[in-house]
Structure formats: structure tokens, C-alpha cells
């Protein structure tokens, strides 16, 4: 499917080396004032060619809105937009039309459709995520107006780990940690800790120079969510969020809160105790559940991690097959990211925003219906 969401639906179209990519965001409420500069900033964060740690492909990523906006405000009608492709070098892929690239969708797309576009991965290219970032930036603005703040950051690349427990596990952030989170985009490596960012940069550079690629983990924290978002059983916020993250190119793992670590613990240590606040409310003392119980938000920070595999396109020689079954070897040329996780941080934020705004609108629709 090329459409994501229920009440708020994003449909994307286009290929990596086609003339353009685009999207239609349907269900966005009318009358909301759009900040186009914020959209441009989100796109800049995703953009390649800004350093030698990312792909040299540099697109302008200028958004052309075709419908759904008038005088800077949403109309409540479908918001359609396109982003032109200009910096394509399709000749780099001419030798791949009869090969199956290891780790790519060549084999599966051929098996499903009987025809595929090998240029940059076609529809399966991470270039498609530029559409998600535009739509996600619109949703992020709407959520911020509701007091919801999404902060994703790089917490691991290869063997380099950032100890982010003070950001990921805290119920309430200190003012210093809030500033730290806001600083994550001030360097090329979007990690709040500058020392760790430098170590990550060195690891990526070493990998690039060896014509290889490396994986990473992106952590995300959402503050300001009210209790009650999500549906029981088959439409949990956790399951929808997992679908959103695993739908990102190269995503290979997902966990809410402490996730897989809880599998080796006892309930006595895994449970988050409830405690009264000074204001007379109730909150958790810890947040190992990641802010969700039964797939429904409880007013605590929503925390999750997404793991990304190493980029499939590498310069090292790999064994593969031609489409006729002949064994051969392959060294991929062209322009590729040595670590996709570096540019995936704003994509994680975008998909989070799309998911959460959809749940907000559903929650309000149900509440209105119940009031009659």
C-alpha cells in the first residue's frame, strides 16, 4: 500500500530517479496556519550532500504545494505537493538491470511485480521519505500547538553507544537536558552528546573509507501526550507506531520503552510503580513501559527505539546472481550513505508525528460521537 493512516491519510508517489516525488495529505483540519520555514528546516535535516558522511547526492528539496492551502492556512481539503528530482545519475545503475543486489528489493520486487526500476532502488529508495518529512512537518506543527514535542536522536552507530538514560528514562527532563535535546541538530551527527557525535562521525568515516556501511539505532522521546490515546487490542498506539517505524527504509528492529531488556527480568523490577504527585495527580515513578499500558498512552513520556541495518549498497565486492541464475560478483558504484541512520532521525520524527496526529483526530472523533 502507498497510503498511511486512517482519518489522517498520507499517500505518496514517485521513484528515486523519476521526475518528481509527491504526496497527498488528506484529513488535515482546516484553518491551521502553516510555517513553511519549519518544513524547509525538517527537509534540510534529512538532506544529503551536507557532509562527507552522507551521500553526495544533493537535491534542493523545494516543496511545491498544489492544493489544500490558501493564504498560509489549511483548507481542510487534500494537501497535495511535489518535490522535483534533479541530481540524478541514472547511468550509475545501467549495469544493475540484470543483477540482484544483496540486501535490496530487486529480487522481491521482481517476484511480486515481474518488472522493476533499478535506478537508485526506484520506489523502494529512501528518496521517497522526503514526502514523509514534508507531511510529518505539517503534523508536527499541529502537535506542537497541542503541547506535544517529538525529539528523536541518534543513540548508536555500530559499536559506538550513547548513554542516554537521563533522556530516555526520565519522567521529567531537567532544563539542562531539554537544552541538550534541542541541540541535537546543531552538528552533522544528530546526537545530543558532542563527544559521542564525534566518535560516531569517526566510525562512519572509517566505514566509508573501507567501502562498507554501518548500522545504527535512533531513540525517540515524545513529551506532552495526554492519557487515553490508542485503542485496545488490534489498534494499539504501540502497534501502529511499530508499523510506522518498520515501514521506514532499512528499519529492522523496534522496541517501546525498555523493550527487549524486559524479557530477562522479573515483574518486581520491570513494573513501574504508581505514585502521587505534589499536585494531587498520579504518575509513574519510572517509565520502563515507555509511556504506554495496553497500547494506550498514560500521560508519561512516550519512548521507543528503532534499529537500522547497514546500507545495502556498498563498494566492496559481494557475491550475487544475475536474473538468469548465473553466479557473479558485484561492487556497487554510485552515491550512497555509509550509514542511513544519520539521515533517518527526521524521518522517525515525521512518522511519529503522522501516527500521533492520526490518533488525536480519532480520539476526538470518538469523544464527539459519544457525547452525541
Predicted regions: what is each one?
Residues 9-14, 117-128, 227-231, 287-292, ...:
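A short glycine/serine-rich beta->alpha loop
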Residues 1-57:
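N-terminal, positively charged regions that mediate nucleic acid binding
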Residues 97-122, 319-336:
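Short acidic, glycine/tyrosine-flanked loop/strand segments centered on an H-E-D-like triad
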Residues 9, 311-372:
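Internal helix-turn-beta structural module
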Residues 13-19, 133, 210-327:
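Glycine-rich anion/phosphate-binding loop at the beta-strand->alpha-helix junction
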Residues 112-230:
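Glycine-rich, mobile lid/loop segments that gate access to catalytic sites or pores
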Residues 42-102, 106:
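Glycine-rich, N-terminal phosphate-binding loop and its surrounding beta-alpha-beta segment
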Residues 19-31, 126-152, 235-243, 300-302, ...:
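Alpha-helical support elements that line or immediately flank enzyme active sites
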Amino acid at each position: 500500500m502507498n497510503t498511511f493512516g486512517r482519518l489522517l491519510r498520507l499517500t505518496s508517489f514517485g521513484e528515486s530517479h523519476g521526475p518528481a516525488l509527491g504526496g497527498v495529505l488528506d484529513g488535515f483540519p482546516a484553518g491551521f496556519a502553516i510555517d513553511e520555514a519549519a518544513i524547509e528546516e525538517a527537509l534540510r535535516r534529512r538532506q544529503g550532500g551536507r557532509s562527507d558522511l552522507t551521500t553526495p547526492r544533493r537535491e534542493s528539496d523545494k516543496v511545491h504545494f498544489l492544493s489544500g492551502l490558501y493564504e498560509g492556512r489549511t483548507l481542510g481539503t487534500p494537501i497535495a505537493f511535489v518535490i522535483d528530482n534533479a541530481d540524478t545519475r541514472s547511468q550509475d545503475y545501467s549495469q544493475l538491470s540484470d543483477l540482484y543486489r544483496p540486501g535490496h528489493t530487486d529480487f522481491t520486487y521482481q517476484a511480486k511485480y515481474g518488472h522493476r526500476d533499478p535506478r537508485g532502488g526506484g520506489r523502494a529508495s529512501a528518496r521517497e521519505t522526503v514526502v514523509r518529512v514534508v507531511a510529518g512537518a505539517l503534523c508536527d506543527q499541529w502537535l506542537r500547538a497541542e503541547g506535544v514535542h517529538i525529539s528523536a536522536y541518534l543513540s548508536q552507530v555500530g559499536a559506538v553507544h550513547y548513554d542516554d538514560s537521563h533522556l530516555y528514562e526520565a519522567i521529567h527532563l531537567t532544563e539542562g537536558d531539554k537544552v541538550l535535546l534541542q541541540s541535537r541538530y546543531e552538528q552533522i551527527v544528530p546526537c545530543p552528546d558532542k563527544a559521542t557525535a564525534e566518535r560516531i562521525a569517526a566510525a562512519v568515516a572509517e566505514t566509508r573509507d573501507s567501502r562498507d556501511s554501518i548500522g545504527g539505532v535512533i531513540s525517540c522521546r515524545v513529551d506532552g501526550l495526554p492519557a487515553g490515546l490508542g485503542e485496545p487490542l488490534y489498534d494499539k498506539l504501540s502497534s501502529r507506531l511499530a508499523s510506522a517505524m518498520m515501514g521506514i527504509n532499512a528499519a529492522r528492529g523496534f522496541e517501546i520503552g525498555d523493550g527487549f531488556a524486559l524479557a530477562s527480568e522479573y515483574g518486581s523490577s520491570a513494573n513501574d510503580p504508581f505514585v502521587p504527585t505534589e499536585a494531587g495527580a498520579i504518575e509513574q515513578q519510572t517509565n520502563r513501559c515507555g509511556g504506554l499500558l495496553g497500547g494506550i498512552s498514560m500521560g508519561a513520556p512516550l519512548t521507543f527505539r528503532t534499529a537500522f541495518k547497514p546500507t545495502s549498497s556498498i563498494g566492496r565486492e559481494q557475491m550475487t546472481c544475475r536474473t538468469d541464475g548465473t553466479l557473479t560478483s558485484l561492487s556497487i558504484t554510485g552515491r550512497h550513505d555509509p550509514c542511513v541512520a544519520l539521515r533517518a532521525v527526521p524521518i522517525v520524527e515525521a512518522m511519529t508525528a503522522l501516527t500521533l496526529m492520526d490518533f488525536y483526530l480519532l480520539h476526538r472523533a470518538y469523544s464527539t460521537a459519544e457525547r452525541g
